[in-house]
């Protein structure tokens, strides 16, 4: 089985279950938060006169969907606006697109050339470079980045939480793949501890790369509740665990594979994120809020259509890490079972999706 950093990516290509075809919700969230990004660019220009020449920005965990196009276009548009306001001749925008090496950079750049870069306008020249690697470590030289953006990536962990087996080697989260109502307290504690460790590494790395007064705009999946086992956090993972358990009962998956698998992801609360940032001490929090949106599948009146669409979207972002544990050959049966479970469960409403947006400025000195 591959390590998390080798198996964590969204479904590739442009097929029915690809991330490129199933990232409309992420695009909606990105578009909603663009005013915050626009304000961040505006603030950068008010802080540093040298930005009138060039701005270095990075989109961390960019995946291969259209969100990156929106981010680059927004930054470029704001720079063009500042160029006109300040009566400068030209500005340059250097954008780095980062994700783990398994990301579908081919699909990303194929769409990028026609949608964003194209012919550089007279006011802003835009240059785009791919940077494969883990954002939990260093990626760039010291004091080289003015702006960091990330959408729906920082909640992914470097590994499954440590300490989820007993001294006797027994699984402590038996039958589940994430925190659930039946998980013992040690599971919740292990997930928070792993997120604390990983997010601290993320902040430490960025604190060296971002210039003084530089800015980060981070959007991540989270929760408004203090309880990490609430359905707003666990809905998809609970139903996937149920689908896997069905295949275990049919003898298609070893029970041990289910009992020893824990998803390397954590949806934190606002308080948990705030505490980690403040403890780290490298950045000030300029803005922070949580907001809820209905799952787009809830717009469908037919529960069968609603369930199938929900399952397809979930497959686009979960299949690579799930297949790494349970095997590629079982994925069609697994997600078919998942779809049936989703449809039967959709007699109840799909929980709203909670996001956290965080704007951080690097502390000077």
Curated annotation (Swiss-Prot):
Pfam families assigned to the protein according to its UniProt record, in alphabetical order: Methyltransf_7
Ranges in coiled-coil conformation: none
Function of the molecule: No detectable N-methyltransferase activity.
Enzyme Commission code: 2.1.1.159
First-level EC class: transferase
Catalytic activity: 7-methylxanthine + S-adenosyl-L-methionine = theobromine + S-adenosyl-L-homocysteine + H(+)
Origin species: Camellia ptilophylla
Note accompanying the cofactor annotation: Binds 1 Mg(2+) ion per subunit.
UniProt keywords, alphabetically: Magnesium, Metal-binding, Methyltransferase, Transferase
One example of a Gene Ontology biological process annotation: methylation
Record-listed S-adenosyl-L-homocysteine binding positions: 19, 62, 99-100, 134-135
Cofactor(s) this protein requires: Mg(2+)
UniProt family annotation: Belongs to the methyltransferase superfamily. Type-7 methyltransferase family.
Binding site for Mg(2+): 173, 259, 261-262
Binding site for theobromine: 26, 152, 155-156, 221
The name this protein goes by in its record: Probable 7-methylxanthine methyltransferase PCS2
Gene Ontology molecular function terms on file: metal ion binding; methyltransferase activity
Residues carrying the site annotation Involved in substrate discrimination: 149, 221, 265, 313, 328
């Amino acid at each position: 089985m591959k390590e998390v950093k080798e198996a964590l990516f969204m479904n590739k290509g442009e097929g029915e279950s690809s991330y490129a075809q199933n990232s409309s919700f992420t695009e909606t969230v990105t578009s909603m938060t663009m005013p915050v990004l626009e304000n961040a660019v505006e603030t950068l220009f008010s802080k540093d006169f040298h930005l009138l020449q060039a701005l270095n920005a990075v989109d961390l965990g960019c995946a291969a969907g259209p969100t990156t196009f929106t981010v680059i276009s927004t930054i470029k548009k704001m720079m063009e606006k500042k160029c006109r306001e300040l009566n400068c001749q030209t500005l340059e925008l250097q954008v780095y697109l980062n994700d783990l090496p398994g990301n579908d950079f081919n699909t990303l750049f194929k769409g990028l050339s026609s949608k964003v870069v194209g012919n550089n306008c007279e006011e802003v020249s835009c240059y785009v470079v791919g940077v494969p690697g883990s954002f939990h470590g260093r990626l760039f030289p010291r004091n080289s980045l003015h702006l960091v953006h990330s959408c729906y990536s920082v909640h992914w962990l470097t590994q499954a939480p440590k300490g989820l087996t007993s001294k006797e080697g027994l699984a402590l989260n038996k039958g589940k793949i994430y925190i659930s109502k039946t998980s013992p307290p040690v599971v919740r504690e292990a997930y928070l501890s792993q997120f604390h460790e990983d997010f601290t590494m993320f902040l430490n790395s960025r604190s060296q790369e971002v210039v003084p007064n530089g800015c980060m705009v981070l959007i991540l999946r989270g929760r408004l509740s203090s309880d990490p086992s609430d359905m707003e956090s666990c809905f998809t993972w609970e139903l996937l665990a149920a689908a896997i358990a069905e295949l275990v009962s049919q003898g298609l998956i070893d029970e041990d594979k289910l009992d020893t698998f824990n998803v390397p992801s954590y949806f934190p609360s606002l308080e948990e994120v705030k505490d980690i940032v403040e403890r780290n001490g490298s950045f000030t929090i300029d803005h922070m809020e949580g907001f809820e949106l209905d799952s787009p599948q809830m717009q469908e009146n037919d529960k069968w259509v609603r369930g199938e669409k929900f399952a397809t979207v979930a497959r686009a972002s979960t299949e690579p890490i799930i297949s790494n544990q349970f095997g590629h050959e079982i994925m069609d049966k697994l997600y078919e079972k998942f779809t049936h479970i989703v449809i039967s469960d959709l007699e109840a409403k799909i929980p709203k999706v909670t996001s956290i947006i965080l704007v951080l400025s690097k502390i000077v000195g």
